[in-house]
């Protein structure tokens, strides 16, 4: 069933393109927007445009940050342990570790994992930028790289590739401990489990 309004259908179609949003949920969201005052709709529209205009990837760690705050607040913080870099798949994983309050090192966001079936190779994610941080021109002083990728086949493949790439550079390569279910995503793991996984990391 389609609505007689092409504008409503266009909005439903736009919402249904979001990850995890089916057609039924998209209809519900469209109806919600329609019932809100114009001011609320304008606020939503401004927020969407603003995030596209202002948010960039940090020039150091590749996490998301505002254009006027680059490098990001984590990279520039004097309270972080600059000898450890935790490698994650996406910005939401950074938030997951930050919520635990236990990890005080730096991060590097790959923005994906190696997945040959999807046509994603090492050059398609932010591996080159990670290696640049370990070069003489990079941050310097890094002694440990923590691999904290999602426990999927693609995550394991990427971890293996990175460990083989990083070990010859003279840094210790570790991996967060098991205890996280295979196939799970880090953003949905509770803080206690994530903290234990980080604390129990082991060499690879």
Curated annotation (Swiss-Prot):
Coiled-coil spans in chain: none
Entry keyword set: DNA damage, DNA recombination, DNA repair, Metal-binding, Zinc, Zinc-finger
GO biological process: DNA recombination; DNA repair
PROSITE patterns according to UniProt: TOPRIM
Gene3D superfamilies: 3.40.1360.10, 6.10.250.240, RecR Domain 1
InterPro entries: DNA_Rcmb_RecR, Rcmb_RecR, TOPRIM_dom, TOPRIM_RecR
GO molecular function terms noted in the UniProt entry: DNA binding; zinc ion binding
Keyword DNA damage carried by entry: yes
Top-level taxon of origin: Bacteria
Zinc fingers, C4-type class: 58-75
Domain Toprim positions: 83-181
Biological role: May play a role in DNA repair. It seems to be involved in an RecBC-independent recombinational process of DNA repair. It may act with RecF and RecO.
Family: Belongs to the RecR family.
Protein name: Recombination protein RecR
Name of the gene this protein is made from: recR
